[in-house]
Curated annotation (Swiss-Prot):
Membrane topology according to the record: Single-pass type I membrane protein
Membrane-side (Cytoplasmic) residue stretches: 1-114
Alphabetical keyword list: Cell membrane, Membrane, Transmembrane, Transmembrane helix, Virulence
Extracellular side: 136-152
Protein name: ESAT-6 secretion machinery protein EssA
Family to which the UniProt record says this protein belongs: Belongs to the EssA family.
Cellular localisation: Cell membrane
Phenotype on disruption: Mutations abolish synthesis and secretion of both EsxA and EsxB, without affecting their transcription.
Pfam families per record: EssA
Top-level lineage group: Bacteria
Recorded name of the encoding gene: essA
Originating organism: Staphylococcus aureus (strain Newman)
Source species taxonomy: Bacteria, Bacillati, Bacillota, Bacilli, Bacillales
GO cellular component: plasma membrane
Amino acid sequence: MLMNSVIALTFLTASSNNGGLNIDVQQEEEKRINNDLNQYDTTLFNKDSKEVNDAIAKQKKERQQQIKNDMFQNQASHSTRLNETKKVLFSKSNLEKTSESDKSPYIQNKQEKKIFPYILMSVGAFLTLGFVIFSIHKGRRTKNESARKSNI
């Protein structure tokens, strides 16, 4: 009895949109059309949009230029010897002179003494090459044996 009354109340209180099986889709579409147009009323869609966009682009370019200038000034400090390098490279008077430097050149004689890594690499290459040749030879041998067995 209680169940019948709950079902009857459900049918009586159910509207076409809330809980009923007949849903009017066209009515819902008409309600949702043009509801959110106010959120698009900004300066980006008005006459002033060109001025705003130009100002934004100008600020962005200025910021990028400032960053580039700061990076160059930080890198071109005294420790990099930028002016000294420019003089050595671009002055004609320094072509005959040798430039003095406190850095020692790379000495190749020390490299010749370390021959052990080269020996190890050559042994490894020899073993790898031998393994490849052995596996190719073994593969051909097994193919030939299987071909002979199938012919018999």
